[in-house]
Amino acid sequence: MMNNNGNQVSNLSNALRQVNIGNRNSNTTTDQSNINFEFPSGVNSNNSVQNSNNGRNGTQNNNNENSIKDTIEQHRQQQQAFSDMSHVEYSRITKFFQEQPLEGYTLFSHRSAPNGFKVAIVLSELGFHYNTIFLDFNLGEHRAPEFVSVNPNARVPALIDHNMDNLSIWESGAILLHLVNKYYKETGNPLLWSDDLADQSQINAWLFFQTSGHAPMIGQALHFRYFHSQKIASAVERYTDEVRRVYGVVEMALAERREALVMELDTENAAAYSAGTTPMSQSRFFDYPVWLVGDKLTIADLAFVPWNNVVDRIGINVKIEFPEVYKWTKHMMRRPAVIKALRGE
């Protein structure tokens, strides 16, 4: 699809405009909507990972406010509509489990679930053949007994590896580790991973940091800002501050990687950078990509991508406050596999 500027927009962004993800049947931790991804230039004006548009007038702000009000009203209406928990229709899921594919992967996700798109990104980067089933929470498909047998937590994402006797894996971090380790075992190439135990430990550390500290804090900040039944300013402030703290950790790590890279590559100016007589930002290597672990992209980096594009809705401008995080995310957002996954293709 196309946005008003004629740029392509992902299926994820389209779904987030239409689907309320704050209702009690939702099993994502995002609790917000109206997030647009634009390609290939990056992320659109609703996101913090974007090019600044200082000429924007009040119309855009009013549209954003109206969008939030509409989403909150949807939340209220759907809570009413689903007070009757007998409203469950999951024949589509039952049929799938009766006729499962013989090979490849099946990803269970939701069109507004960042963690589901996190898995899709890695599947796409590794070149694995997979099919995505976007569950309909309104029909209660996530409560289908067959799906609960795959994920006892009845949440997304979940993955079935049909090449391993329909092995089911749940929790996004566990899924990513399964995929990169399987690829490494089958090909001998540690793509998005490492053959070095020390690097593997660091990748695991950042991955666990993302799944336990980054995503949940953003989800809570969004919940208390837009969907909690009472306005609790201290909760909004507490979770927003924690998100900033988390991004500060990532920013510092990337900045250290940036300094090391520039000093290694720009040897003719290294002394001037060390002495402080020339800003390191003037180096021709200053915008080169840097990664959290080693000198290549891994799942430690990619796990952050879908979540990095919602933080503007809690009042955090990544480009201004965390410039290294901004550049890092833009480098990943330009990758064809990431674009494909975020479009839901």
From Swiss-Prot:
PROSITE patterns: GST_CTER (PS50405), GST_NTER (PS50404). Residues 196-345 form the GST C-terminal domain. Gene3D superfamilies: 1.20.1050.10, Glutaredoxin (3.40.30.10). One of its GO terms (biological process) is regulation of nitrogen utilization. It comes from the Eukaryota. Residues 41-66 have a biased composition (Low complexity). Keywords: Nitrate assimilation. InterPro entries: Glutathione-S-Trfase_C-like, Glutathione-S-Trfase_C_sf, Glutathione_S-Trfase, Glutathione_S-Trfase_N, GST_C, Thioredoxin-like_sf, Ure2. Residues 22-36 have a biased composition (Polar residues). Disulfide bonds: none annotated. The keyword Transport does not apply. One of its GO terms (molecular function) is transcription corepressor activity. Residues 22-66 are annotated as: Disordered. SUPFAM superfamilies: GST C-terminal domain-like, Thioredoxin-like. Homodimer. Belongs to the GST superfamily. Plays an important role in the cellular response to the nitrogen source. URE2 gene plays a major part in the repression of GLN1 and GDH2 genes by glutamine, and is required for the inactivation of glutamine synthetase. URE2 gene product may catalytically inactivate GLN3 in response to an increase in the intracellular concentration of glutamine. PANTHER family: GLUTATHIONE S-TRANSFERASE-RELATED (PTHR44051), TRANSCRIPTIONAL REGULATOR URE2 (PTHR44051:SF3). This is Protein URE2. It comes from Saccharomyces bayanus (Yeast). The gene is URE2.
